[in-house]
Structure formats: structure tokens, C-alpha cells
């Protein structure tokens, strides 16, 4: 058996918990106080490659975000050729809970999990932070049953007038329709939509809207809620990648979730409002009658949790099953085939859809095959002076 290794004269590494694109997550013991922690080790690479901006952004944000429903950042330091980020240790995640068929989730259990998700988001939005990567395996669960938001690598500060963002955020199944139509300016409504998807997933015990491409994702959304009309979402036609879809009438939400309470359906319908300006806010959602009607939210200590994450996942995703902290994205971003057009990039798949629409064909019925290209490398910050980085991190954690 491999002996535990000490890192930075303080942390005693135990077993590997997970492995992703940018590094490894270890379970470790803090020799300073004996507590169990999770250490995310990120490869810095060669001098010319620099430090991954995502990791530094996550450190910066989590230093400012202190809340019972947000993962706690304990420490961060460079060691040898790696950047180490130390977090509180969490036992499992919400995806493992949802997938474990041996667990029964009562209406009170679902209400408790959703309430903790929304409380974490309410704090983030109060600090003008968008999470932008809400999904069940980024919602970690600790020994006391408390759910905490994690993986803030895609998070951004919002609220500045005119500020533009990329629309390629969130795993596709949790991506709001305005993002799928290429919106560059958005706010906390995108997190609300994702939280609604997670809410529905808790109720159904499976992902709610499972598109296999961005186009198919829109088709799944329209099949569930009907094709939006101009009076429902006036700004829709102004979005960069907007294409007119074949009209589909909205089915009854009750037909999709037949056993759910009326209060839960009402909250879901407000979280899935097409127009982001009219979509319910996190603060409004927490005040919805769903949370005050019976049954009451279950005490976190009494919430069901899987005995083993690995047992709760399919055998073909074992590494994903044991991730504890900031796991790698399970759904690789699918980028349409792009060709240069002027000074920017033009989405050829959108051109195909527009042409089909002009020809009188229904884009929703077309069979589009979008090839998955490797996304461009994330921008990096030069790390030539690593001693400067170490001094900076040391000062910040004094």
C-alpha cells in the first residue's frame, strides 16, 4: 500500500478521488488540525504555458464568497510544478443522490435540496456573481447533509451595463434558451433556468431536457413548453443565432410531471419562463408558496444519501462517480463547424437552418449532425515568476 505523501509540510495526501482534464483531486488530512480536506492539484505546465486562468478565477471568487451553501476554500499554493487548491471535504454530490435507485426522495427531501440550491444562488447573485455551471455533480453534499455549490471556474461578475459574455456556458442540458440562441448579454436568469432543470431532475430522477446538440436541445425545450411566440419573448428575434422554428403547441406541464404538487408545478413554470426578463428571480423563488406549503423541507441531517457514490453510478463512468470536488465536465461542449467570416466566426449550422427555413422546411424536423470539435484552450496567465505567485497566495491566506 502506497504511503501517504505530505504536501507543503501540512497536508497528508490519501487516495485519489477523481481525475479530470486539468488535474487530480486527492483526499488528504490537514496535519494542522486533523481535518479531512480535498485537494485539487492543477498542472501548471511549462513556463511558457502559464497558469490556468480558470483556477485563479475560482480562487479569487471563492475567497470572497463565504456562505453555508457554497464550498469553502481553505488554502491555495503552488507546489513543485502544480497549483494546489484546498477545499473542505464533501462526501458525495446531488447527481449520486438522483441516480441511486435505492434511495427514496420524498417531496420534503426534494424541497430541502432545492431550497439549499436557491439559497446558495441567492447569495451569489447578491454578490453579483453568476455561477454559469449549475448541474447536479457540481452540487456537493457534506457529512451533515448540507448541499453546497462548487466549481466556480466559469463564474463571472455581472451587473455592468453592456458587458458581454460567452454563450457557451453550462452543460447543454441545463442551458437556458437565450444562451442556445447566442445571447451575449444575460444575468442571473440563466442560473434560474438551470436550477429549474435540476428541480425537474430531482422530481423525475432523470435529466429533464436531454438534447444531443444545441439544435436538438432547443427542440427538446420547445417540445416540453411549446415554441415561444413573439408576445411571450419579444427580444427573442434579436438574438444572434435566432432561427424561426416550426410551431409546437405547449403541452400541459402536468402531463410531463403527473405526480407533482400544484405548487411545485407553478414554481417550475415560473423558472422555465422563456423571456429572461419575466423569469422568476432566485429571491422570488425562495418566497414562493411551494416552500411554505406542506410538507416542510426535510432537515438536512435526515436527507437520504448514497453509501457509495461509485455504487450509484454506471460502470462506464467510474472516474466521474468518485469525483468529490470541481469534477471535469461530463458533457464536452459541442461546437458547431465554424468557418471564418469577416473578423469573426460564423456558425454554419445556423446558416443551414436559416436556408431550410427560407425553403419552407421545418428546422425542427431536419437531421443535423454537428461534429464535436475540441474547444480552444482556455487563456492563461504567464507564470514565469512563480515565486511571485507563491508570495501572492501566501499573503492572501494569512
Swiss-Prot record:
The modification Phosphoserine is found at residue 160. GO terms for biological process: cell differentiation; regulation of cell cycle. It catalyses: L-seryl-[protein] + ATP = O-phospho-L-seryl-[protein] + ADP + H(+); L-threonyl-[protein] + ATP = O-phospho-L-threonyl-[protein] + ADP + H(+); [DNA-directed RNA polymerase] + ATP = phospho-[DNA-directed RNA polymerase] + ADP + H(+). Autophosphorylated. The active site is at 133 (proton acceptor). Pfam families: Pkinase. The modification Phosphotyrosine is found at residue 22. InterPro entries: CDK, CDK7, Kinase-like_dom_sf, Prot_kinase_dom, Protein_kinase_ATP_BS, Ser/Thr_kinase_AS. GO terms for molecular function: ATP binding; cyclin-dependent protein serine/threonine kinase activity; protein serine kinase activity; RNA polymerase II CTD heptapeptide repeat kinase activity. Residues 11-291 form the Protein kinase domain. Its EC number is 2.7.11.22, 2.7.11.23. It comes from the Eukaryota. Residues 308-318 have a biased composition (Basic and acidic residues). It is found in: Nucleus. GO terms for cellular component: nucleus; transcription factor TFIIK complex. PROSITE patterns: PROTEIN_KINASE_ATP (PS00107), PROTEIN_KINASE_DOM (PS50011), PROTEIN_KINASE_ST (PS00108). The modification Phosphothreonine is found at residue 166. Keywords: ATP-binding, Kinase, Nucleotide-binding, Nucleus, Phosphoprotein, Serine/threonine-protein kinase, Transferase. Residues 296-318 are annotated as: Disordered. The keyword Transmembrane does not apply. Belongs to the protein kinase superfamily. CMGC Ser/Thr protein kinase family. CDC2/CDKX subfamily. PANTHER family: CELL DIVISION PROTEIN KINASE (PTHR24056), CYCLIN-DEPENDENT KINASE D-1 (PTHR24056:SF554). This is Cyclin-dependent kinase D-1. It comes from Arabidopsis thaliana (Mouse-ear cress). The gene is CDKD-1.
Amino acid at each position: 500500500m502506497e504511503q501517504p505523501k505530505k504536501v507543503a509540510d501540512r497536508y497528508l495526501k490519501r487516495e485519489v478521488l477523481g481525475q479530470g482534464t486539468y488535474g487530480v483531486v486527492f483526499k488528504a488530512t490537514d496535519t494542522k488540525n486533523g481535518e479531512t480536506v480535498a485537494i485539487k492539484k492543477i498542472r501548471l505546465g511549462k513556463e511558457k504555458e502559464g497558469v490556468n486562468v480558470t483556477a485563479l478565477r475560482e480562487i479569487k471568487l471563492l475567497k470572497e464568497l463565504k456562505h453555508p451553501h457554497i464550498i469553502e476554500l481553505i488554502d491555495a499554493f503552488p507546489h513543485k510544478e502544480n497549483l494546489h487548491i484546498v477545499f473542505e471535504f464533501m462526501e458525495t454530490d446531488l447527481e449520486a443522490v438522483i441516480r441511486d435507485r435505492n434511495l427514496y426522495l420524498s417531496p420534503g427531501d426534494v424541497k430541502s435540496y432545492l431550497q439549499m440550491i436557491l439559497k446558495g444562488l441567492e447569495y451569489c447573485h447578491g454578490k453579483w456573481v453568476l455561477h454559469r455551471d449549475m448541474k447536479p455533480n457540481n452540487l456537493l453534499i457534506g457529512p451533515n447533509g448540507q448541499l453546497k455549490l462548487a466549481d466556480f471556474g466559469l463564474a463571472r461578475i455581472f451587473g455592468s451595463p453592456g458587458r458581454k459574455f460567452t454563450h457557451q456556458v453550462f452543460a447543454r442540458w441545463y442551458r437556458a434558451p437565450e444562451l442556445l440562441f447566442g445571447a451575449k448579454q444575460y444575468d442571473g436568469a440563466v442560473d434560474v433556468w438551470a436550477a429549474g432543470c435540476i428541480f425537474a431532475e430531482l422530481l423525475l430522477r432523470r435529466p429533464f431536457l436531454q438534447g444531443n446538440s444545441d439544435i436538438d436541445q432547443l427542440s427538446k425545450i420547445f417540445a416540453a413548453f411549446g415554441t415561444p411566440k413573439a408576445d411571450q419573448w419579444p427580444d427573442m428575434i434579436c438574438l444572434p443565432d435566432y432561427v424561426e422554428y416550426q410551431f409546437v403547441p405547449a403541452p400541459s406541464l402536468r402531463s410531463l410531471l403527473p405526480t407533482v404538487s400544484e405548487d411545485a408545478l407553478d414554481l417550475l413554470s415560473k423558472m422555465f419562463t422563456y423571456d429572461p426578463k419575466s423569469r422568476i428571480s432566485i429571491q422570488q423563488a425562495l418566497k414562493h408558496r411551494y416552500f411554505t406549503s406542506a410538507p416542510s423541507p426535510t432537515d438536512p441531517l435526515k436527507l437520504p444519501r448514497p453509501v457509495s457514490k461509485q455504487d450509484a453510478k454506471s460502470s462506464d463512468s467510474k472516474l466521474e462517480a468518485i469525483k468529490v470536488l470541481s469534477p471535469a465536465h461530463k458533457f464536452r461542449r459541442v461546437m458547431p463547424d465554424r468557418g471564418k467570416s469577416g473578423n469573426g466566426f460564423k456558425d454554419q449550422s445556423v446558416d443551414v437552418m436559416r436556408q431550410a427555413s427560407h425553403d419552407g422546411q421545418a428546422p425542427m424536423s431536419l437531421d443535423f449532425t454537428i461534429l464535436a470539435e475540441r474547444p480552444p484552450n482556455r487563456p492563461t496567465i504567464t507564470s514565469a515568476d512563480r515565486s511571485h505567485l507563491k508570495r501572492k497566495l501566501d499573503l492572501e491566506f494569512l
